[in-house]
Amino acid sequence: MSNIKSTQDSSHNAVARSSSASFAASEESFTGITHDKDEQSDTPADKLTKMLTGPARDTASQISATVSEMAPDVVSKVESFADALSRHTTRSGAFNMDSDSDDGFDAHAIFESFVRDADEQGIHIRKAGVTIEDVSAKGVDASALEGATFGNILCLPLTIFKGIKAKRHQKMRQIISNVNALAEAGEMILVLGRPGAGCSSFLKVTAGEIDQFAGGVSGEVAYDGIPQEEMMKRYKADVIYNGELDVHFPYLTVKQTLDFAIACKTPALRVNNVSKKEYIASRRDLYATIFGLRHTYNTKVGNDFVRGVSGGERKRVSIAEALAAKGSIYCWDNATRGLDASTALEYAKAIRIMTNLLKSTAFVTIYQASENIYETFDKVTVLYSGKQIYFGLIHEAKPYFAKMGYLCPPRQATAEFLTALTDPNGFHLIKPGYENKVPRTAEEFETYWLNSPEFAQMKKDIAAYKEKVNTEKTKEVYDESMAQEKSKYTRKKSYYTVSYWEQVKLCTQRGFQRIYGNKSYTVINVCSAIIQSFITGSLFYNTPSSTSGAFSRGGVLYFALLYYSLMGLANISFEHRPILQKHKGYSLYHPSAEAIGSTLASFPFRMIGLTCFFIILFFLSGLHRTAGSFFTIYLFLTMCSEAINGLFEMVSSVCDTLSQANSISGILMMSISMYSTYMIQLPSMHPWFKWISYVLPIRYAFESMLNAEFHGRHMDCANTLVPSGGDYDNLSDDYKVCAFVGSKPGQSYVLGDDYLKNQFQYVYKHTWRNFGILWCFLLGYVVLKVIFTEYKRPVKGGGDALIFKKGSKRFIAHADEESPDNVNDIDAKEQFSSESSGANDEVFDDLEAKGVFIWKDVCFTIPYEGGKRMLLDNVSGYCIPGTMTALMGESGAGKTTLLNTLAQRNVGIITGDMLVNGRPIDASFERRTGYVQQQDIHIAELTVRESLQFSARMRRPQHLPDSEKMDYVEKIIRVLGMEEYAEALVGEVGCGLNVEQRKKLSIGVELVAKPDLLLFLDEPTSGLDSQSSWAIIQLLRKLSKAGQSILCTIHQPSATLFEEFDRLLLLRKGGQTVYFGDIGKNSATILNYFERNGARKCDSSENPAEYILEAIGAGATASVKEDWHEKWLNSVEFEQTKEKVQDLINDLSKQETKSEVGDKPSKYATSYAYQFRYVLIRTSTSFWRSLNYIMSKMMLMLVGGLYIGFTFFNVGKSYVGLQNAMFAAFISIILSAPAMNQIQGRAIASRELFEVRESQSNMFHWSLVLITQYLSELPYHLFFSTIFFVSSYFPLRIFFEASRSAVYFLNYCIMFQLYYVGLGLMILYMSPNLPSANVILGLCLSFMLSFCGVTQPVSLMPGFWTFMWKASPYTYFVQNLVGIMLHKKPVVCKKKELNYFNPPNGSTCGEYMKPFLEKATGYIENPDATSDCAYCIYEVGDNYLTHISSKYSYLWRNFGIFWIYIFFNIIAMVCVYYLFHVRQSSFLSPVSILNKIKNIRKKKQ
């Protein structure tokens, strides 16, 4: 250590000596970036040095350009600069640096110059230490949670009573207990513990994320003396919690994601007064260079379902985004998950740099920390079942436990050793004589710690630090620094950096980027609007200007409003809410700013569709073709569309789940449909619901649009003069009346204003008053949405609570435990993970090797930016039964790509040979191999045991006894240590199994299939601690010893774990092989290869896995001069591998293959009928336990039924009553829209699970996903439609006789449910994603509703479209429902519905009308009168049926037609899924069409 400088003065002197002249002259400066000292021109290194250390500072853009110019050399030096800065801070906070180092890129001087510049220019850098004293946190006791089912609804009163009782007597449990810590500014604290130890909870408490702890948090957390409550109120932006999961907007690129985060934190006062643009670019390039993301700038971030960057790169994006938040205190929760060993080390070094130079404070949990990573930290704390068992300097931890009696095994990393102590079933090396003295349980460890001198010293250090810090000074620095950073219009007390309107601007810009990134949704939206406008416009083509077209004109305008109301349903989305919560935690922007920004960004795209829609519809339908009318209707349609869209978005902002939002939106949709005043006019509304029309924007828009259309219009009476025909035509019009609303005796026309006043109570002077009202609605909804979004608290979560199957023994056992002492005091995210995690004594003696898997010269190429990109480059290898092959390489090297290619899961240009026993793979390959994916995707409502049982039944041969399969499942449960939670529901992330338990389940699902060829595993230890990882690898070793072939990618193996593998395939970026061959005992074989080919000698204390990754230049920023791929191609080992591969092919191809009896080379292991049985059971079970989904469905039907029933209560016998009966049936059908949205939201999860995991393993036939989903939906729809029938039909008070009621029930509750469930699923299964399905569904519904004869009578339809009236299934449902209600129903017109006229002198009304009534419908109310004859147009309900082109006699004909549509939906559902997802035909995709057009243009150019 004599050559290490540790004082601040020496560091400053070193920087001062780094002038541009000495830098250029020094032979040691920028080693590896060689140049002739006599050259006249400056090298890039010289330029950069002058910029940073010369008297005149250059701008960030010039620096960035210069770094780019020298990038090939500079990047190769970043790792060495990280090493230099990865020394420990001393008590004084200075960093250490080797003075003899010949590192070329003097990063310390560069970073120090920035810090010095900030100091010279008076720019403060915030920093604070953290003191944690006796902190405890309580949560709901998750050990006795029971999953709810549909049975809870059937016993609703008892369920409500139990819920109230449970709420009052809610059991709490200790999550963390009496934790203490001290982190001075500039220190890094490593938090160790197994999953479930409370590490995540400790970090959340430290970061102030305490809302989720139902039992509250006690103790004291302070930041340089500032209490946590005050810190969260005034300086929340400085405390950052970075969660374990990577949630991002998938359609944004990496560059856009980072730019946005940096822009939100761009200070007003910047070093050297660089511009905002330059600041953002330089920061982004800095983070991207450190984490190796520059090559991904233009790649989408993606997620589990949207292709983007790799999982490791996505994790690095998360880290860079968190750093962009510019916190002074960071809490990193398992931030190295998914990173390879080299990149994980670089991450730790990067955090070390930030703490050294910026004096930030970091708390980090890492489940698999290598010795190199461990040594970058200052202090370490160890948690065991929520209890703290050590806190202190890292080099004192091992001696502390050695004094206790525990010894660290040779070559075991210190972090691994410390974590292993908290595993009661793990292997522990104990000093002789201490076997009965060492602590074993969490309580014993805690007692030892509390009585230790180390604990007493820690308490003294905390007390001394609290005395030392100047809290007021810290506040002053924070206030001054934040004032310097805040932009001009940011509130003084706000902890956000940029002003609110700047946040809105940035969120709007990001909204445009998101929409552009997801082109398919936008294209589908606009195209559907254009298609619908052509169809509807042609349906109402040249609507007559006479009275016969008045109702149709209203129908055109109503349809336009209804269509964009339905489109508003598609805007309900919850997938981005976790991202919003994360960014809120980072203090990037107000959630309300995103609410406004997303609205503003989507508005232009909505306007494009709406404008195209309206222009086509307006001119085709023949509306009032004046400029005033055109622009007025367009304006009000736009205002109403935006207002209703705001209404639905407001609803989604206040709801917790998608099902809740869909249910409420469904009720609102019915209200919008009914109370627009088109279906039921104001005079006909009942007083208890009439107020609804006044609180919805559509009523005001519809009034103004009708006024614009009918004001000043003279409508001739067409075919409605009464009486007419025969001798009546010779009489004067003085003896006739126009049988139309608003008519006057003796007039052959009706004024538009009179029609509106009498029919709707509308007056023209309200037109522009309504404009103001609509503005109020629009602004009101937006304001409410903004408020709800800003202050909406997330659903309490973060700690995964286990939920047991109802009635399970495990649940009953825990529920009976009264004493709190019996409750495991461990983190809710893993209550039972620490139990039974050690090595299990189960033996696999029944695995028999079935073949050798060989791949030779495998290449994989994909289209990329108009060209091709090779992801795998002539990779060869083999897997022999009884061996384990590790697949390693840095993130993005192609490990997962190779695994997917070998497992037949990639689609692209694949060349090379993949053989089993020397022969090409057959149809049974996928099901005879197991594949454990990185993504842990499962059915949330199944238990662990049920998930395993289903996999075993589907993937093992059918001829095997079921008892044998189930016994093997139980064996796997024991081997994986899952007995304690085998009856627990899988659940969702945050409420169910935790990361480790999900990973074990993913492995178990493949193991129970007992693959007899090969087991692929993609990062099986990702997210697990070292002990769980060891247990998993030991399990794989047992499988290999029993004859299993295993190929496994692995990121961060310890030395002991790495040496468990027999063979290694090492890849570098570009999918190029660097090594394939044996590892050897103590890694001797592979180390010999690398040392012999030019790598430095590996020290005996080093981890061989990290050593070889370092040697080949793996990592985000590392680089080496040697071309290890070229060395491999020229090596003896490569020739031996080629020979071995060819020998295996030659020898094995001559042998006869052995196959298990009954195990034919078929695609599936079981028959279709067998699959159908168990897939249906699984899907039905999932539905039965989905209480939230079922409750949402029930509320939609129940409330919807009551709503319709009491809106049209007692329709009566009047003319309006006839219309109301028809509209009641029409609205009942419209209710299917939100119901289908619910169906699609539910079904998409099962589709994604099948496509991502189950289809890849050939578990069962793809059609069963569709069919079982359909069959499982039906019982609930039949049940809840019965509730709807009772609550809607009988309040109408039409006919109560059983025959009519039964027929109505048959049509609506059975036939209609069978129809629309299939329709909703069919549309979903043809769509690329859920939002697109919602749009297409809206298009189809509006299409069918338009042609069912309600809004436009068939008599007025153009001849071309009458076939669509016949083709629309809703036509026949409306005919039957209305026919049942109106058949033989007598009509008695109300006084205002009668048409009055005078007969000729000397005639009574009856005598005068007798000839007319013999041919026409209706009746005279006063036949003996001689004046003011009162005529009613209908006499019986069947007259009205005839008017709408329907007859009661069509009832059973239509019933047969229903079956045709039902079967068509089912067949079409299967066919479209096969076309678009099995065959993956993409030629119909709008984006594919656009891309093909672009490619054609490029070729022409």
From Swiss-Prot:
Chain positions found as Phosphothreonine: 1153
Family matches, as InterPro entries: AAA+_ATPase, ABC2_TM, ABC_trans_N, ABC_transporter-like_ATP-bd, ABC_transporter-like_CS, ABCG_dom, ABCG_PDR_1, ABCG_PDR_2
CDD domains found in the cross-reference section: ABCG_PDR_domain1, ABCG_PDR_domain2
Pfam families: ABC2_membrane, ABC2_membrane_7, ABC_tran, ABC_trans_N, PDR_CDR
Bias (Low complexity) ranges: 18-30
Alphabetical keyword list: Acetylation, ATP-binding, Glycoprotein, Membrane, Nucleotide-binding, Phosphoprotein, Repeat, Transmembrane, Transmembrane helix, Transport
GO molecular-function terms, A-Z: ABC-type xenobiotic transporter activity; ATP binding; ATP hydrolysis activity
Protein residues bound to ATP: 889-896
Keyword Membrane recorded: yes
Span list, region Disordered: 1-56
Record localization: Membrane
Record carries keyword Ribosomal protein: no
Bias kind Polar residues: ranges: 1-17
Annotated transmembrane regions: 521-541, 554-574, 600-620, 628-648, 664-680, 771-789, 1190-1212, 1216-1236, 1277-1296, 1333-1352, 1455-1475
Gene Ontology BP annotations: intracellular monoatomic cation homeostasis; xenobiotic detoxification by transmembrane export across the plasma membrane
Phosphoserine modifications at: 26, 29, 64, 80, 86
GO cellular component terms, A-Z: cell periphery; mitochondrion; plasma membrane
N-acetylserine modification, residue list: 2
Listed Basic and acidic residues bias regions: 34-49
Other noteworthy facts: Present with 1300 molecules/cell in log phase SD medium.
Protein family per UniProt: Belongs to the ABC transporter superfamily. ABCG family. PDR (TC 3.A.1.205) subfamily.
Function: Could be an ATP-dependent permease. Confers hyper-resistance to the mutagens 4-nitroquinoline-N-oxide (4-NQO) and triaziquone, as well as to the chemicals sulphomethuron methyl phenanthroline when present in multiple copies. Exhibits nucleoside triphosphatase activity.
Protein name, as recorded: Protein SNQ2
Higher taxonomy: Eukaryota, Fungi, Dikarya, Ascomycota, Saccharomycotina
